[in-house]
Amino acid sequence: MQICKYLVVNPRDVQWGLTVSTVGYEEIGVADTYPTRGHADGYYFDIDKGRVLNEYQLLYITEGEGIFNSAHAKDIPLKAGNLFLLFPGEWHTYHPTGKNGWKSYWIGFKGKNVDDRVKAGFLSVYKPIYHVGFSADIIRLYEEAYKRAQEEAPYSQQILAGIVNHLVGLMYAL
């Protein structure tokens, strides 16, 4: 099962310094095909070939386990309670493993604000995995982001940017 929303960004939103392009949740069962279909162009990938995105994505695994690879990080185990950050221009692949599949949330974003954090060394392609454990606060933030994305109300991009900042802050601090 997958629920997701892809968003349109306008030039004024970009001036805010951080925009959100996608937010969603998926449950992958043991017998399910991964990745699931229904992703917009540029998002679907073959787990053997991987992909390169033009944005950051922050994923949170709430159940299950998997494996992550990128150009700078090889064969990193993923487990429930992990947040992992995908970087623009960075080849990567990941998928669930084990007997249980997994449940995950994601949010895709880009902008000068996040680029500056990478340049300052707060976020790095060499350390894309953060173990934060189970967090009802993080789940609530992802659910709020999905709700706001569905509404597409005026200034929703600014609210979504605040949610991303909160998620990244929790990831960095926990």
Q: For each of these PLM feature ranges, what is it?
A:
Residues 1-75:
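Generic protein-terminus/edge-of-domain signal
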Residues 25-31, 112-115, 173:
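Active-site/binding-pocket entry motifs
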Residues 42-43, 80-81, 89, 99:
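Tight coil/turn sites that cap or link beta-strands
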Residues 65-67, 83, 91:
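Structural motif
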Residues 72-87:
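Short acidic-glycine-tyrosine-enriched beta hairpin
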Residues 89-113:
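Ligand-binding loop in jelly-roll beta-barrel domains
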Residues 116-174:
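Amphipathic alpha-helical segments enriched in hydrophobic/aromatic residues interleaved with Lys/Arg
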